[in-house]
């Protein structure tokens, strides 16, 4: 008997990744392509799954992890659509309807919520015995800044979904002259601390910044404020930091120190690991 397969989409602002795999996470086939306009991008994804079904069998279900913001309430008129996204041309794009003809269940969540669920299932959100932690927050710091929250195996949803990148931190004293680049809030966390914001200050690519450049202290301060906010409001058992900016390992001890600073000794329990 053929092992059941599942379909998945990682819908990013610059690229789409479509895959077929099994329930244990084994990939059978994967393809990636550039994110263009909604019609052409979603048509390419649809074509991949139609062809893949001939090779691997009809998937049991499709999971879509997308950039946002998204309408995730199945009872809402705009369910499955992108809302006020900064991605040009994608406002009001329907991510579910193009795959209705596959005749399989479709699950939708944000890319960071999905990443949080993956960390909880297979990655850094597990205890030493392999069981998942009860609560986890995953933060990505890259082109954008976002956070996903898992509580007892389910991603957190409410009025919409967490948008941790859009709180407004206290400005670093050496960064008062930078206006921020968020089109909605200017100097929110994303507008101050995402990859493009760092590049805007440096005037060159992030990878060429020296390890002792003061930008890292500024970046760590803003991310430390975020971690302190998460600890005080959501009280997760673990915060996982990922994304392109976090490839700069020097940030981890700096963020840890600034998190402790902003917590002010109010929460003494902490554990920071890198890897």
Please give the residue ranges for each predicted region.
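A short acidic/small-residue loop/turn micro-motif
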Residues: 35-36, 162-165
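General beta-strand structural signal in soluble alpha/beta enzymes
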Residues: 106-110
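Active-site glycine-centered loops adjacent to acidic/histidine catalytic or metal-binding residues
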Residues: 10, 111, 142
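ATP-binding/phosphotransfer module of carbohydrate and carboxylate kinases, centering on a glycine-rich
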Residues: 1-61, 70-79, 96-105, 121-133, ...
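Short, small/polar residue-rich loop motifs at catalytic or cofactor-binding pockets
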Residues: 14-15, 142-144
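Active-site histidine-anchored catalytic micro-motif
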Residues: 147
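A charged helix-plus-loop insertion that forms the helical arch/lid used to bind
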Residues: 76-91
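A cytosolic small-molecule/anion-sensing beta-strand core signal
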Residues: 151-152
């Amino acid at each position: 008997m053929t092992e059941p397969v599942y379909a998945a989409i990682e819908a990013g602002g610059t690229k789409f990744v479509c895959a077929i795999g099994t329930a244990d996470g084994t990939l059978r086939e994967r393809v990636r392509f550039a994110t263009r306009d909604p019609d052409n991008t979603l048509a390419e994804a649809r074509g991949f799954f139609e062809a893949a079904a001939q090779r691997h069998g009809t998937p049991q279900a499709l999971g879509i992890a997308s950039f946002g913001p998204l309408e995730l309430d199945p009872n809402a008129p705009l369910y499955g659509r992108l809302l006020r996204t900064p991605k040009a041309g994608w406002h009001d794009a329907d991510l579910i309807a193009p795959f209705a003809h596959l005749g399989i269940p479709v699950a939708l969540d944000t890319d960071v919520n999905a990443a949080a669920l993956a960390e909880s299932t297979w990655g850094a959100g597990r205890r030493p015995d392999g069981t998942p932690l009860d609560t986890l927050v995953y933060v990505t710091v890259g082109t954008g800044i976002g956070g996903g929250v898992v509580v007892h195996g389910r991603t957190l949803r409410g009025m919409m979904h967490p948008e941790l990148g859009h709180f407004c931190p206290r400005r670093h004293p050496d960064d008062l002259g930078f206006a921020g680049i968020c089109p909605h809030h200017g100097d929110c966390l994303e507008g101050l601390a995402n990859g493009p914001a760092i590049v805007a200050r440096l005037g060159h690519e992030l990878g060429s910044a020296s390890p002792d450049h003061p930008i890292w202290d500024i970046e760590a301060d803003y991310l430390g404020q975020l971690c302190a906010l998460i600890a005080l409001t959501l009280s997760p058992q673990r915060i996982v930091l990922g994304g392109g900016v976090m490839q700069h390992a020097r940030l981890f001890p700096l963020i840890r120190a600034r998190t402790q600073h902003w917590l002010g000794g109010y929460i003494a329990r902490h554990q920071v690991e890198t890897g």
